[in-house]
């Protein structure tokens, strides 16, 4: 199983879900979104604990995960978003190291250019590409995860 994860680009006023996609050995592709926004009355680290629990659940339910590819965001809308991204990146890469799973970040422009032919594609463009491939993404985060999956499946790394 190859796992493709988008690290959340959450911001306090507008939290976004994490898009994900899995390519199973039998060729089955599953995808979706997951929310890790801080809940009321929670400490700041709870979102990361939920993230790690979710990673472990995916690993357990999908069998062996042989690679993780994630969206490498180089610009953030603000300090809070940068801190959240750094926290998720730290936990994701440590989790991969702990389980001896290779991982690679993929720049946003690379994902968009591979999917649409232009590195500055809009969210709607990314959703349209996913739909053209036969998927029904909930939002652009899931569409981006599917784009990363296809980038990796086509050996672009």
Q: Where do the language-model regions lie?
A:
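Phosphate- and other anionic-substrate recognition elements at nucleic-acid/protein interfaces
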Residues: 1-157
